[in-house]
């Protein structure tokens, strides 16, 4: 009894234990292997928050809980002291109770940390919702501002159009006014011109009047001079008559004698005088008539000329007025055309500017919408994760609540010594359904092969077309015979050989499929962890209801589960590394090529040589079998290729011996490369299996070294493979056949361990598609150029024939990726059954 009294009298012993367990539990919970989904929560909230919360905020709660538990334990030990001492198992019971207290305190600490994390996540969710609301309000405000700006822009554009219309109207009015002013100016100029013309006509008439007056004066002067002359002649005549009369009077005798003559002279003078007067009158009359007639003619001519000039001037003025009106109309039409062109250019510029601005705004809105969609998707994913965490926490909280209720009922039964039947409390089943939508966006995969065949045949004929035709017929017959033999050989080979699948080209889709498989495995591991935690909670509940021995077993199981979790995490990391190395090994093992025959036929296009793809098998055995089959097929094809060539050599009997030796030397190189690939893949896969079993980092380093050696061996094989293509010149019967083959090999891309090999077969470059990190390759091109030159000469006829035949084949392969969606629906149903047992106390009285 002294032991129980000491323990009851010293409650600090009970208080000392929970503090130690609390510190130890906090250290244990800080380890990465323990805790409820500590890895998944490390992404959302830091672990420092939970640790600081445990140190600061949980101290009073833990003290209170430890005090309550210590009081309950003291009462329990005091009431059961006699029974336990009589039973002889007091130390074991105390140890089990201390372990239960440690367990409950640790669970309380975890529960408080989970509650704090839930509050923190709720606060983050509220902040995110506030940001989303602010963004939505901002977008709404932007939209309202845009509407307001659009309305203002429309109004301003309407006003601008009105102003432009008014401006055009004013411009048209000004043009019309300018036209009127121009018309008036022209009319004024015309009137001034008419005035000048009339003044000039007046001056001309005045000049004519002056001239006519001068002519009249001259004529008057002539008349006066003639009158003076007549008077002078009359006076002279009279003087002469007087002289004659005087002479007559002097000689009277003579006069007497000549009396009869006196009358004759006077009559003669009278007659002469009358004749002279008549002549002078006639001359005067004729001169006057001539002057009058001349004056009348001149006046008539002047009047006629004036009328013609006036009519011509009127016509000229009319034509000028018409020309001015037409020019004015033309200027007005030009002005309207220029204004319309300016308006059209302005409208086009405005339309282009508006279109560019609208396109910019549309692009900006699309970018914003895409960003908001991405943000919403991210928030939805985070919200889904938080919901999953919340459901798990609700389950654990319910489990802890039931545990606490069970402990309280046990304490109450032990303290009050209440007897009652055994009952079980069954918790209602909780069903968690989580839908994970997994999308892989890949473009539809299509293979489009474009082949462009150009065949150019040039023939130059010099002499004797008959001989050339005979030569051509013989050559064609030989070629037809050779092609028939080749076709027969090919048919036999096809019957013997099975269908062979060619080496695949690993596209970016395989990488995405591997990543999708890794994500599915990670999700499956998370679900397994949740199930393990549900099992832990069930075990904890059963441990709370069972007796002392079961609690020890539960603790051992929890420790073992923690160790298995740590081991599981290590195994997950190792499994990921194994997957990466296996993917690399499979990629390196898959990259082998099978030669494709290219029979040469007379005047026929080059046959196509597509690169066929085969899906890679994940299992190592299947890959090895495929590699062996590929080796066999390659050997058969090499033998088949060598056989027709050797037959041709036997027929023509002049082929050098070096060519078959070279081709035979090529085949062992390929066989060695294939054997090295197979041995390397076997060793790597065996070592990976050993690593997963033994879980030692040293062997992982060895695997990496082997992978590096493998990359080196692949480099050697890749270096050997291009040495197989060689140029051959064959001289047969004086004929020279020069075959030039152009080969294009794709550049090596990818990691340092992965290299791609290009195998040249029959002048074709069949190279596998390259793999890119981050970028999808969609185009593969194979270009083959073949030139055959033949010169035939015959000494007898002296005819030469020069034939050049060039064939170019271009092959283009386009690959597109496929889009598909995977929906993974995982439903988790957890049923928890808690059983509480009421233990009867037996007290023995002394």
From Swiss-Prot:
Positions annotated as glycosylated: 48, 431
Bias (Polar residues) ranges: 1-10
Record key words, sorted: Acetylation, Cell projection, Coiled coil, Cytoplasm, Cytoskeleton, Glycoprotein, Intermediate filament, Methylation, Phosphoprotein
PTM annotation (Phosphothreonine): residues: 564
Location of the region described as Head in the Swiss-Prot/TrEMBL record: 2-104
Basic and acidic residues biased stretches: 500-510, 534-553, 576-603, 610-675, 687-709, 718-730, 746-758, 769-783
Residue stretches of biased makeup (Acidic residues): 489-499, 511-533, 554-575
Region (Linker 12): 248-264
Chain positions found as Phosphotyrosine: 319
Chain spans, region Disordered: 1-52, 483-783
GO MF, any single term: structural constituent of cytoskeleton
Listed Low complexity bias regions: 22-45
Annotated segments matching region Coil 2B: 291-411
Record has Signal as a keyword: no
Annotated positions of the Omega-N-methylarginine modification: 43
Protein name from the UniProt record: Neurofilament medium polypeptide
Naturally occurring in which organism (per UniProt): Rattus norvegicus
């Amino acid at each position: 009894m002294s032991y129980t009294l000491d323990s009851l009298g010293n409650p600090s012993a009970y208080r000392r234990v929970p503090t130690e367990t609390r510190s130890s539990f906090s250290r244990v919970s800080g380890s990465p292997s323990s805790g409820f989904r500590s890895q998944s929560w490390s992404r959302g909230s830091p672990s420092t928050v939970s640790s600081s919360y445990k140190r600061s905020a949980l101290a009073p709660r833990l003290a209170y809980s430890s005090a309550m538990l210590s009081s309950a334990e003291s009462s329990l030990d005091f009431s059961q002291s006699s029974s336990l001492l009589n039973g002889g198992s007091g130390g074991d019971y105390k140890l089990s109770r201390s372990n239960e207290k440690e367990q409950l305190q640790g669970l309380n600490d975890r529960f408080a940390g989970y509650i704090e994390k839930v509050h923190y996540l709720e606060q983050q969710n509220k902040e995110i919702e506030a940001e989303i609301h602010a963004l939505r309000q901002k977008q709404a405000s932007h939209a309202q501002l845009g509407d307001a700006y659009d309305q203002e822009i429309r109004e301003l554009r309407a006003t601008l159009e009105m102003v432009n219309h008014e401006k055009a109207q004013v411009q048209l009015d000004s043009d019309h006014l300018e036209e009127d002013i121009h018309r008036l100016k022209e009319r004024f100029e015309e009137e001034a011109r008419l005035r000048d013309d009339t003044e000039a006509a007046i001056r001309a008439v005045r000049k004519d009047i002056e001239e006519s007056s001068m002519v009249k004066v001259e004529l008057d002067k002539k008349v006066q001079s003639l009158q003076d002359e007549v008077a002078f002649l009359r006076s002279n005549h009279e003087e002469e008559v007087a002289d004659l009369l005087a002479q007559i009077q002097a000689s009277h005798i003579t006069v007497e004698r000549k009396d009869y003559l006196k009358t004759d002279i006077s009559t003669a003078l009278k007659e002469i005088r009358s004749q002279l007067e008549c002549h002078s009158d006639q001359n005067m009359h004729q001169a006057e008539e001539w002057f009058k007639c001349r004056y009348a003619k001149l006046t008539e001519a002047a009047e006629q000329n004036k009328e013609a000039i006036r009519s011509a001037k009127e016509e000229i003025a009319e034509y000028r007025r018409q020309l001015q009106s037409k020019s004015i109309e033309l200027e007005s039409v030009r002005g309207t055309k220029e204004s319309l062109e300016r308006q059209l250019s302005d409208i086009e510029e405005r339309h282009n500017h508006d279109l560019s601005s609208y396109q910019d705004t549309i692009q900006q809105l699309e970018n914003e919408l895409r960003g908001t969609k991405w943000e919403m998707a991210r928030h939805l994913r985070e919200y889904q994760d938080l919901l999953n965490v919340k459901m798990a926490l609700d389950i654990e909280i319910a489990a802890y609540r039931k545990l606490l209720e069970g402990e309280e009922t046990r304490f109450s039964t032990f303290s009050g010594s209440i007897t009652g039947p055994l009952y079980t409390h069954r918790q209602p089943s909780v069903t968690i359904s989580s839908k994970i939508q997994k999308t892989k966006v890949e473009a539809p995969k299509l293979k489009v092969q474009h082949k462009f065949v150009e065949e150019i045949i040039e023939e130059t004929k010099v002499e004797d077309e008959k001989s050339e035709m005979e030569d051509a017929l013989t050559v064609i017959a030989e070629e037809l015979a050779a092609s028939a033999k080749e076709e027969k050989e090919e048919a036999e080979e096809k019957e013997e050989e099975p269908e062979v699948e060619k080496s695949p080209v690993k596209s970016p889709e395989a990488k995405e499929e591997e990543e999708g498989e890794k994500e599915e495995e990670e999700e499956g591991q998370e679900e397994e962890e949740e199930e393990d935690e549900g099992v832990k909670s069930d075990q904890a509940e059963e441990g709370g209801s069972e007796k002392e021995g079961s609690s020890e077993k539960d603790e051992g199981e929890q420790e073992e589960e923690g160790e298995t979790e740590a081991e599981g995490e290590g195994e997950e990391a190792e499994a990921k590394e194994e997957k990466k190395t296996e993917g690399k090994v499979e990629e390196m093992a898959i990259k082998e090529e099978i030669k494709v025959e290219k029979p040469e036929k007379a005047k026929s296009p080059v046959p196509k040589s597509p690169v066929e793809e085969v899906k890679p098998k994940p299992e190592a055995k299947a890959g090895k079998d495929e590699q062996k089959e590929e080796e066999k097929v390659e050997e058969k094809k090499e033998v088949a290729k060598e056989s027709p060539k050797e037959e041709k050599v036997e027929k023509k009997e002049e082929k050098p011996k070096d060519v078959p030796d070279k081709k035979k030397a090529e085949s062992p190189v390929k066989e060695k490369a294939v054997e090295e690939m197979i041995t390397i893949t076997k060793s790597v896969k065996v070592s990976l299996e050993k690593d997963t079993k033994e879980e030692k980092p040293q062997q992982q380093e060895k695997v990496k070294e082997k992978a590096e050696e493998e990359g080196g061996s692949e480099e050697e094989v890749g270096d050997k493979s291009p040495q197989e293509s060689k140029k051959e010149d064959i001289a047969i019967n004086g004929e020279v056949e020069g075959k030039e083959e152009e080969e294009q090999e794709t550049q090596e891309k990818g990691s340092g361990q992965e290299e791609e090999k290009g195998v040249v077969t029959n002048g074709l470059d069949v190279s596998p598609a390259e793999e890119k990190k981050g970028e999808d390759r969609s185009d593969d091109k194979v270009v083959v150029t073949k030139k055959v030159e033949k010169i035939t000469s015959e000494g007898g006829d002296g005819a030469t024939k020069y034939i050049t035949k060039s064939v170019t084949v271009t092959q283009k392969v386009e690959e597109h990726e496929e889009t598909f969606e995977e929906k993974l629906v995982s439903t988790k149903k957890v049923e928890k059954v808690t059983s509480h047992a009421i233990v009867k106390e037996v007290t023995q009285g002394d």
